[in-house]
């Protein structure tokens, strides 16, 4: 008679229990962050161009960024859109950044389905005026108390419909392609490109 190895029931039960515990652990860990009610579910990443709306959303602000020039000049870049279904025009009354008043050049009331595009004057000079559409361009300027690139500051827009407060990233305008020479690491960076 040949000897056959016989597995004990204890070993099989232990393996089954181990597989069950592993599967239950994986399921429990995966379900921890699967729900919508998490600590970070309502946080918006601090990236260029944050957006928000007022109560009932007759006016939206998009692409909100505090721009700094290389000369230290500051302004707010944003687009305000009137999407009021009652065909009412709305007025931008004021903008503040971290409590500091922003100067707005002649902002006219925003008609239904029209936009107000604002930025530093040097950036607006690069934009071509559209031949169609309902867009007004407004220059903004702001006292720069020492904003740091990559920082986040609160921006409050006050419209005739109410206030919209949003956190905006502080950024530099995009450099023109091929104009700026960025030296990285001195001679080692130059030598690595040969």
From Swiss-Prot:
Q: Provide the alphabetized UniProt keywords.
A: Signal
The transmembrane segments are none
- Leader peptide range in chain numbering: 1-30
Q: Which proteins does it associate with, and in what oligomeric form?
A: Has been detected in a cytochrome bc1-aa3 supercomplex; its deletion however leaves complex activity unaffected.
- Quote the protein name from its UniProt record: Uncharacterized protein Cgl2664/cg2949
């Amino acid at each position: 008679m040949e000897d056959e190895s016989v597995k004990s029931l204890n070993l099989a039960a232990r393996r089954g229990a181990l597989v069950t515990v592993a599967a239950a652990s994986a399921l429990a860990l995966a379900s921890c962050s699967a729900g919508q009610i998490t600590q970070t579910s309502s946080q918006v990443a601090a990236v260029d161009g944050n957006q928000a709306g007022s109560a009932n959303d007759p006016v939206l602000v998009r692409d909100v960024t505090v721009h700094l020039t290389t000369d230290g000049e500051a302004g707010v870049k944003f687009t305000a859109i009137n999407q009021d279904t009652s065909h009412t025009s709305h007025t931008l009354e004021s903008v503040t950044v971290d409590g500091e008043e922003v100067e707005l050049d002649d902002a006219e009331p925003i008609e239904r389905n029209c936009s107000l595009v604002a930025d530093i004057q040097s950036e607006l000079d690069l934009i071509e005026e559209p031949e169609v559409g309902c867009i007004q361009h407004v220059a903004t300027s702001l006292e720069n108390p020492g904003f740091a690139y990559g920082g986040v500051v609160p921006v409050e827009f006050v419209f005739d419909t109410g206030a919209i407060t949003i956190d905006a990233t502080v950024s530099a305008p995009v450099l023109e392609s091929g104009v700026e020479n960025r030296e990285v690491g001195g001679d080692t960076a130059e030598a690595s490109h040969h």
